[in-house]
A protein has these predicted regions:
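Transmembrane helices with small-residue packing motifs
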Residues: 12, 20-58, 113-123, 377-381, ...
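Interfacial helix-loop-helix hairpins and adjacent transmembrane helices
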Residues: 1-15, 415-427, 456, 462, ...
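Helix-loop junctions and hydrophobic alpha-helical segments within the transmembrane domains
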Residues: 319, 326, 330, 392, ...
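Transmembrane alpha-helices and their membrane-interface boundaries in multi-pass membrane transporters
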Residues: 394-409, 433-452, 459-499, 611, ...
Length: 1022
């Protein structure tokens, strides 16, 4: 049974199956989860270690170095990077792409658990797998109030809002940041203690002894078993004040007689501010497979209902919403399909002048989209910026398939005077099956090498390539088997005749004259090719290079750092001016600030932090980069003491997943690490003068943890007073920090009781008062601290950064007004210049530039592999070598036009644009296959020279129709009419549009000439 008979016999089954799959696809679309990015397992683990308060150098020796050594021994661990500060360490462990990260995380946790016994007492750690949905929330809110305390706001967030939201299916975690935690502060009067002959330890022990709640046994009576409790727990301020102590000379004394007992809050060295007011931040995280859009809707609905039950004095503000990007991507696909279909339909209507023929194309393309969605659903994928972008970018290719089939059917079955045109429809489809199969394979085969692309590029773009490959396969099947059945059923060929059988139109006549001239004067071929390549080369020189496409996310992060050692309070004062600038910008909708903390949970000092700024609707403002520049310039001019950088959150987030997020990262290493800080300062000053480097964003990588005051006890003097160094240290601690001696159960959890000793002077202690702190000896003698110790100023010790056990310093900078590639090249030239780096100091570049270089090398490999795959396919199709070489040559030459398109539109050559280059190779080959297949068919009935000419004329209309339709279908994506939803795929669309426009004359003019040159000399002239 041949193709025609088989399709004829199963036409009803084919129709029902296609319609059923399309309907199932509609239901799949309704059930598909939505997200910003696909679920990607980044091969990176973060370990946060807290060992109390200790100098950075001691933390390195006691904690960081041994832990690094243990982690480096984990199987498959590639890199171990660490940052060590006072009592804190942050370590990153990198693994190869494709590693089972659940097992890798277990390996890290196992190594850490084995290390804990050998670490300083009290050391705690947390192991975090670097996943976007773990590191960053999809939605964030702030609670503020002018009358409700921060303690009550935190309780509201922790004990009411968080549990409510955790009840929503798909929510993995709800975190809070900011607010105050209640504690009771016992301030002891040193004079009263001396008068009653008591010590701080006496008071602490009495409080602890008075707060007991423990089981003391069981009692059986009356056939029942009772559990016995000793319940002498404290209940509040009154019960604490009434605690009694026994004295030798004064009998029993109440705690209230020794000082004051008041409500207080746990000290914290970070701030969270929303719209300039102290706030409690609520961050909502989703499970990896959850539908972020429906989650956000439910979260918003539940919070709106909850806030109706709260006092009006409490305000809830949403300052981050990731689903806005998803909505924009969905809108981009919808607009792409609708606009693309309408424009492509107009193209079909213009050339064929038949509404029903146009309707066939308008039906097949949406069916291909819905069935593709069904396949994605079955594969467990989600709608995200990659899969949605793949659907939007594939619209032009889907239209291309059905257009050439409809044109073939129209040309064969629309012949005037044909007795049985309906019977010719399937015959025409059968004739076209081989070129259609070859052309479809030419496009599909380029996606095979992309499956082997590694790194962050492969992780993201494999979803886009898989989506497009599935769409093209579905489109091929619908075009080959369903479109002919629709065409035969819907088009009345007895009443309608193909316009191509009428008098040749102006386009065909023009093409014929150009083709005749090219065939007669083949010398114009190399001239034209060289001219095209020359223009492409010039465009390439003027086209910048980048990593990922620039995308307006609707908000950005303002990372800041005041001078090292600046107190939290002073940093807050300086940032008030920055907040005022942001608040007064008319394009800002909301903002939230963290000082001493960060969005991604990174290691931060009290003089560091970030501000997330959410902008108003994109339709009511300039693009985000102009707004960022406005704020940057204003802060630079008005707040000179603040070092800062701006970046968009998701871009910054992706950078954190694979390394440093900054575009320029210079890793400096030296045989003598002591010279690194000075070298880093010099390098930072030098790169600040490079065009493209934002001077305000340059960070020398030297991050002092703030100055310190060391209490150095004279052991001999302490011994003479009957004390040890630890005794002196403890009493100083009682003045400064105090000690939490016990906890009692309050209304909303445990409440700590902190015991402190009031300083001799009222208010906060000053540096010059420390040496006069009264120290009490065991014999009752009181003397100033300076009698047994001296207070020494210690300049701030920088954080210590290491990579694979080697100390480094990382100088970073943001790029502005210039592309990343040329800026990094300028940095390299500077660093390679003699005298910039002293002998023994080496450097490597990291950050986004490193990722860009890795991605470009990978894409070059993909392009080469795709070219080889195309040649192999063409060899199977034609079983000769010259034709594949000519076809691939025309496609490669068309790729040069991509640089022209990027230059004209001002878009950088990034990974998405390079993806478009690879696709041009396939699309160009597809167009060439249409021509060569027609040429080979005509060679059976006419001389080859004549067949070259006639095949080009015959394929003019279908190729022109497909090119025009594809350009128009991709135009909304290339123009980014939907804003951020289009911007990720905009370079790809521009690359394809530029490439296929040039490929049109390459196939219809250059290729006939090139093939003609391979003919025997006797056949070259017709």
């Amino acid at each position: 049974m041949n193709f025609v008979s088989w399709v004829e016999h199963h036409r009803r089954s084919i129709m029902v199956l296609a319609v059923a799959l399309a309907i199932a696809g509609v239901f799949a679309i309704a059930k598909m989860p939505y997200g910003v990015y696909p679920v990607i397992s980044f091969p990176r683990v973060r370990i946060e270690i807290d060992a109390g308060t200790r100098p950075a150098q001691q933390q390195l020796f006691d904690v960081t170095a041994p832990v690094e050594t243990a982690l480096r021994q984990i199987p498959h661990a590639l890199n171990v990077e660490s940052t060590t500060s006072r009592g804190s360490t942050e370590i990153f462990v990198d693994f190869p792409w494709g590693t089972d990260m659940n097992l890798a995380q277990l390996g890290v946790e196992g190594a850490m658990s084995q290390m804990v016994p050998s670490l300083p007492a009290g050391t705690s750690y947390d192991v975090i797998q670097m996943l976007p949905n773990v590191i960053m929330p999809f939605s964030s809110y702030s609670l503020t109030s002018d009358s409700v305390s921060q303690v009550d706001l935190l309780r509201l967030a922790q004990y009411q809002i968080a549990p409510m939201l955790m009840g929503i299916k798909g929510i993995s975690y709800v975190g809070t940041l900011g607010g105050d935690q209640k504690e009771v502060e016992v301030h002891l009067n040193p004079a009263q203690l001396k008068a009653f002959g008591l010590t701080v330890d006496d008071v602490s022990n009495a409080i602890t002894a008075a707060n007991t709640l423990e089981g003391i046994g069981h009692l059986q009576d009356h056939d029942l078993l009772y559990l016995m409790f000793a319940n002498n727990g404290l209940t509040g301020l009154k019960s604490i004040r009434d605690i009694t102590l026994q004295t030798a000379q004064h009998g029993i004394v109440r705690l209230a007689d020794l000082g004051t007992v008041t409500d207080g809050v746990v000290p914290r060295w970070y701030l969270v501010v929303d719209q300039g007011k102290p706030s409690v931040e609520i961050n909502v995280y989703q499970q990896s497979s959850a539908d972020v859009v429906s989650l956000q809707d439910q979260v918003q609905k539940d919070l709106a209902s909850f806030m109706k039950t709260q006092p009006k004095a409490i305000h809830l503000v949403k300052w981050y919403d990731q689903t806005q990007l998803v909505a924009s991507s969905v809108a981009a696909v919808q607009e792409g399909i609708v606009i693309g279909l309408i424009l492509a339909g107009l193209v079909v209507l213009y050339f064929l002048r038949n509404w029903r023929a146009t309707a066939v194309a308008m039906i097949i393309v949406p069916m291909a989209v819905t069935i593709t969605s069904l396949v994605l659903y079955v594969l467990g994928m989600s709608f995200n910026m990659m899969t949605l972008g793949g659907l939007a970018a594939s619209i032009g290719l889907l239209i291309d398939d059905v257009i050439v089939m409809i044109e073939q059917i129209a040309r064969r079955a629309g012949v005037p005077g044909l007795e049985n045109p309906e019977a010719t429809v399937l015959e025409a489809a059968k004739e076209f099956l081989k070129p259609l199969t070859g052309s479809s394979l030419a496009t599909i085969v380029i996606f095979i090498p992309l499956a082997f692309l590694s790194g962050v590029t492969g992780a993201f773009f494999k979803y886009l390539s898989l989506t497009m490959a599935v769409a093209l396969i579905i489109s091929y099947l619908l075009t080959a088997f369903v479109a002919p059945i629709f065409a035969r059923s819907m088009i009345d060929f007895k009443k309608w005749h193909d316009p191509s059988h009428e008098k040749p139109g102006a386009m065909r006549r023009l093409h014929g004259r150009l083709l005749d001239g090219a065939l007669r004067r083949p010398i114009f071929l190399p001239i034209g090719v060289l001219l095209l390549l020359g223009i492409g080369y010039v465009a390439m020189q003027h086209t910048g290079s980048g990593f990922l496409p620039k995308m307006d996310e609707g908000g950005f992060v303002f990372n800041y750092q005041t001078n090292p050692g600046t107190s939290l309070a002073e940093t807050n004062v300086q940032l008030a001016t920055v907040e005022k600038i942001i608040k007064e910008n008319k394009y800002v909708a909301a903002f939230s600030r963290r000082t001493g903390a960060g969005l991604g949970g990174d290691l931060n000092e009290p003089n560091q932090g970030d501000i997330y700024v959410r902008l108003i609707d994109p339709s009511k403002r300039p693009n985000i980069w102009k707004v960022m520049d406005q704020i940057d310039d204003q802060v630079t001019n008005e707040v000179p003491g603040v070092n800062f950088g701006t970046d968009q959150l998701l871009t910054d987030n992706i950078g954190d997943m694979v390394g440093r997020p900054e575009p320029i990262v210079i890793n400096l290493a030296a045989k003598n690490p002591a010279v690194l800080n000075d070298v880093a300062n010099n390098v930072a000053n030098a790169i600040s003068n490079i065009r493209g480097i934002d001077p305000s964003s340059v960070n020398n990588g030297v991050t002092p943890a703030g100055d310190a005051l060391e209490v150095q006890v004279n052991n001999a003097a302490a011994t003479l007073n009957g004390m040890t160094a630890n005794d002196v240290q403890t009493q100083v601690n009682d003045y400064l920090k105090g000690t939490v001696v016990t906890q009692y159960i309050g209304e909303a959890g445990d409440v700590g009781i902190r015991v402190k000793v009031d300083s001799p002077t009222s208010g906060q202690l000053r540096q010059d008062q420390l040496e006069n702190l009264p120290i009490s000896a065991p014999n009752g003698r009181v003397f100033p601290l300076k009698a047994v110790a001296k207070v020494v100023f210690v300049a701030g010790q920088p954080e210590i950064t290491r990579a694979n056990l080697q100390q480094i310093v990382q100088v970073t900078g943001e790029v502005s007004g210039r592309d990343l590639g040329s800026t990094a090249a300028a940095v390299q030239r500077l660093l390679n210049k003699p005298g910039t780096l002293p002998p023994g100091v080496t450097y490597t570049l990291g950050g986004q530039f490193k990722q860009q270089q890795q991605a470009q090398r990978g894409m070059i490999g993909v392009f080469t592999a795709a070219m080889v795959a195309e040649i192999i396919l063409l060899l199977f199709l034609y079983e000769e070598l010259l034709l594949p070489i000519i076809i691939i040559a025309t496609s490669v030459i068309s790729v040069s036009a991509v640089f022209v398109g990027l230059w004209i539109t001002g878009i950088e050559l990034n990974i998405t644009a390079m993806m478009g280059m690879v696709m041009i190779l396939g699309i160009g080959t597809e167009m060439a296959v249409f021509y060569v297949s027609e040429y080979q068919t005509l060679c059976e009935t006419m001389p080859r020279r004549e067949a070259l000419h006639e095949a080009a004329l015959n394929r003019l209309r279908p190729i022109l129709m497909s090119v025009v339709a594809m350009v128009l279908a991709l135009l909304p994506l290339g123009a980014a009419v939907s804003g951020s939803g289009d911007q990720m795929q905009q370079p790809l669309a521009v690359a394809i549009i530029a490439g296929i426009i040039v490929q049109l004359p390459m196939v219809l003019l250059a290729m006939p000439v090139a093939i003609g040159l391979t003919l025997p000399r006797s056949e070259r002239r017709g």
